[in-house]
């Protein structure tokens, strides 16, 4: 096991940006940059013994400076949607960037966690710890927040993402990673299983309605391994809104801590991925908005070429009655762990 550091590029501010390669004894390799705490590449062995890069991304720092799809991004302070780009906390109204119609998505797509240079520390032969101090009212959110995000590659082919954030006063924190996975060709050759009996339906703006609906007898039911290609053309309204999945699943056993929440496998490559988390929800997204984006090695990424599995608190939870609020303060840190296990 080893960690290699090298310069990835020069930021417009003049600062050097680095990338880190972590390789285990099986040859699995994770490539991370301290710009945006982004996962650039993840090389996993397929059924033929060859290593495939199973995540979408770019070749250069310059391309990540834009990164509209948010490939591999650490998203914060708040992932997903906030209706009308505002929320109330302790009697005060906070206004956010209206970056998706009248609403807010992923906090600030131009100045979020994925667009800043993080400090770094190589904390062992298999992990890199990235840290960032977010100032009071940055992105429109109250409170100063010091966050650490650690990538760890295990000898058993697991990639662990650990988050620890400390605010100095009450604020919203809902941090996740926005990696696009491609285990083999596209989502049509991949089977999915999500350990959730319910999901949160959305309106035409992809804002949860507040309902928690059972997946049973709907195309949203992924409680058993399923191919989803034929479902994308169904007349089920929730899938017609964006012509794909972009929904929060209400995970089973939400208060039992770190647990298996989802599984995927590609018969084409033979690669399996299990997802573990301690979060109550997970956003499942089938790259509905990808439009001929040129990525690594000149590959053109198209709609449905990849999927995201983003453990988190429910979208728009701060504004929705009955949803657990992602509110933290100096006496309550944001702590979360996600693991992507490959075999």
Where is each model-derived feature located?
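An exposed, glycine/acidic-rich loop-and-rim segment of catalytic or binding clefts
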Residues: 1-343
């Amino acid at each position: 096991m080893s960690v290699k550091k090298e310069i990835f590029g020069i930021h417009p501010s003049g600062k050097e940006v680095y990338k880190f390669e972590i390789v285990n004894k099986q040859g699995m390799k994770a490539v991370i940059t301290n710009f945006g705490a982004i996962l650039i590449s993840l090389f996993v062995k397929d059924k033929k013994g060859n290593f495939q890069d199973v995540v979408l991304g770019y070749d250069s720092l310059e391309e990540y400076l834009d990164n509209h799809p948010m490939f591999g991004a650490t998203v914060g302070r708040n992932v997903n949607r906030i209706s009308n780009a505002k929320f109330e906390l302790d009697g005060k109204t906070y206004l956010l960037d209206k970056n998706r119609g009248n609403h807010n998505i992923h906090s600030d797509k131009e100045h979020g966690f994925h667009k800043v240079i993080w400090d770094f520390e190589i904390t062992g032969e298999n992990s890199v710890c990235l840290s960032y101090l977010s100032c009071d009212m940055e992105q429109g959110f109250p409170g100063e927040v010091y966050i650490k995000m650690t990538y760890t590659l295990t000898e058993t082919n697991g990639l662990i993402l650990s988050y620890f954030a400390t605010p100095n006063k009450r604020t919203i924190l809902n941090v996740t990673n926005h990696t696009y996975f491609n285990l083999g060709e596209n989502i049509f050759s991949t089977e999915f299983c999500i350990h959730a009996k319910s999901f949160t339906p959305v309106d035409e703006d992809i804002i949860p309605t507040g309902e928690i609906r059972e997946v049973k007898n709907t195309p949203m039911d992924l409680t058993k391994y399923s191919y989803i290609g034929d479902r994308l053309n169904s007349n089920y309204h929730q899938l017609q809104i964006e012509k794909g999945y972009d929904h929060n699943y209400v995970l089973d056993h939400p208060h039992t801590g770190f647990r298996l929440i989802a599984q995927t496998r590609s018969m084409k490559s033979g690669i399996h991925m299990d997802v573990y988390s301690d979060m109550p929800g997970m956003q499942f997204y089938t790259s509905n908005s990808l439009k001929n984006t040129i990525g690594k090695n000149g590959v053109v990424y198209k709609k449905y070429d990849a999927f995201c599995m983003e453990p988190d608190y429910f979208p728009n939870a701060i504004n929705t009655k009955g949803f657990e609020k992602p509110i933290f303060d100096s006496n309550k840190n944001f702590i979360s762990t996600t693991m992507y296990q490959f075999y």
